[in-house]
């Protein structure tokens, strides 16, 4: 009887331990999802790489059709350029693609998508999406030069090739914040709020 009780108690303890392990894994997954969703404020967060106000690194690279693309430097079309760092297997990038096209048309920007990955992955992406005037470049070197750590990531260049805004662009709001950061003249929301505070204090005085 005592032996049966010990066996039963050990079984229950093991079941409880397994249950705790499953619960812990579930909690860790939820924490990861929460971190993923709460991270980006888009272009209103500054990070590593060339700073806003710096001249962008320049590259001459072939696009998906073999035509050469100049990244950085003065724009031949005399208009801003939006560099979008993506990957063909990135689901967020895939969902964001129609928004990139619509914002590019509305704002009259040139758009260069800079991607990395396997050739067959790029072929599937290009077969699925109509690029229009968007140039598609495969290059890990460009991402390294801008020190892009997460995607989708946007960098806005003015017509002279100077970086005016940059940041993660997980949603339409993030893309819009990229444009607002450029229009407001601030690299981050922190700078914008500090400027507003100083302006308010000056008026109060």
Swiss-Prot record:
Q: Does the keyword Membrane apply?
A: yes
Provide the GO biological process annotations: methylamine metabolic process
Enumerate the Pfam families for this protein.
AhpC-TSA
**How does the protein associate with the membrane?**
Single-pass membrane protein
TM ranges are: 5-25
Keyword tags: Membrane, Transmembrane, Transmembrane helix
An annotated GO cellular component of this protein is: membrane
Please classify the protein's predominant subcellular localization into one broad category: membrane
Q: Which residues form the Thioredoxin domain?
A: 50-184
Functional note? May be specifically involved in the processing, transport, and/or maturation of the MADH beta-subunit.
Q: What name does this protein carry? A: Methylamine utilization protein MauD
Q: Provide the species name.
A: Methylorubrum extorquens (strain ATCC 14718 / DSM 1338 / JCM 2805 / NCIMB 9133 / AM1) (Methylobacterium extorquens)
